[in-house]
């Protein structure tokens, strides 16, 4: 059992020995989430979790009337949960993921805004700072490449570089940085560029620290988005590896048509290049 904190939600990850069927429902007074998992039991005892800064107060286990494993999440307030199962990927086996979103924050986001009437004036050319979206690769469940000797994790290296780069951008007149992630949590690949677009970013920089077979490799590589896709075998291998991050980091694809998603993603990339 692991807990991750992101700015907009708290994530709980249950490692399971195989695929599981689960049923989730909410209780109030006090706020709780109940998860019944069929044909399951807890191996050993649950680890103590640091719940500071999260929506979770405590985790308890027991048995339901039907004999299923029952997990009760005591909450600090009203939440809107989302749960899904993940198949094995990378170093991880089967997982059950429960994301807890702050209900009040979500309600505020969806409230329709009624703009005040404006006088019609000649439009002036927009002048603003150049916004640079800085994306630290991987994060949370997805460590990225891991060093063989010191077990250095790519997600930590990329975040440190992103934070330093943001400082440099902030010091440059006419430029403003935005960090796609600013902590140890996972952001889905599609959500990364969606966040950049919501902030009207002009430049998107994704930072990675990949591993290669040869120990003599050093220096850096720069990849630019191409309408023709990966231009060589190394670029294709790197692209396939990074695009698989959602399976490791934990993004549900149950509600998406995978072929449609890929087509829309390709169209979106091409449109971005043309713009």
Residue ranges, per PLM feature:
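Signal-peptide-cleaved, periplasmic/extracellular N-terminal interaction regions immediately downstream
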Residues: 1-132
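Catalytic-core regions of hydrolytic enzymes
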Residues: 111-258, 269-274
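Flexible glycine/proline-enriched surface loops and loop-helix/loop-strand junctions
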Residues: 261-267
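Short clusters of hydrophobic/aromatic residues that line enzyme substrate/ligand-binding pockets
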Residues: 49, 56-59, 146-147, 238, ...
């Amino acid at each position: 059992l692991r807990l991750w904190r992101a700015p907009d939600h708290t994530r709980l990850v249950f490692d399971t020995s195989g695929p599981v069927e689960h049923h989730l429902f909410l209780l109030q007074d006090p706020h709780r989430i109940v998860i019944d998992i069929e044909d399951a039991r807890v191996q050993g005892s649950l680890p103590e979790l640091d719940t500071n800064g999260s929506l979770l107060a405590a985790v308890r286990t027991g048995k339901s009337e039907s004999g299923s494993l029952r997990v009760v999440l005591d909450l600090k307030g009203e939440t809107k949960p989302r749960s899904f199962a993940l198949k094995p990927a990378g170093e991880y086996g089967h997982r059950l993921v429960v994301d807890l979103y702050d209900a009040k924050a979500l309600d505020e986001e969806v409230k329709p805004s009624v703009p005040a009437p404006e006088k019609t004036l000649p439009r002036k050319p927009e002048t603003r700072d150049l916004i640079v979206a800085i994306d630290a690769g991987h994060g949370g469940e997805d460590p990225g490449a891991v060093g063989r000797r010191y077990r250095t994790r790519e997600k930590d290296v990329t975040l440190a570089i992103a934070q330093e780069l943001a400082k440099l951008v902030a010091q440059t007149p006419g430029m403003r940085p935005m960090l796609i992630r600013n902590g140890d949590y996972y952001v889905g690949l599609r959500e990364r560029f969606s966040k950049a677009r919501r902030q009207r970013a002009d430049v998107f920089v994704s930072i990675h620290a990949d591993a290669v077979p040869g120990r003599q490799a050093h220096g850096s590589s720069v990849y630019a988005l191409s309408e023709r896709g990966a231009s060589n075998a190394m670029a294709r291998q790197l692209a396939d590896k990074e695009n698989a991050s959602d399976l490791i980091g934990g993004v549900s694809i149950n509600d998406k048509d995978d072929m449609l998603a890929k087509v829309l993603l390709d169209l979106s990339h091409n449109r971005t290049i043309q713009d």
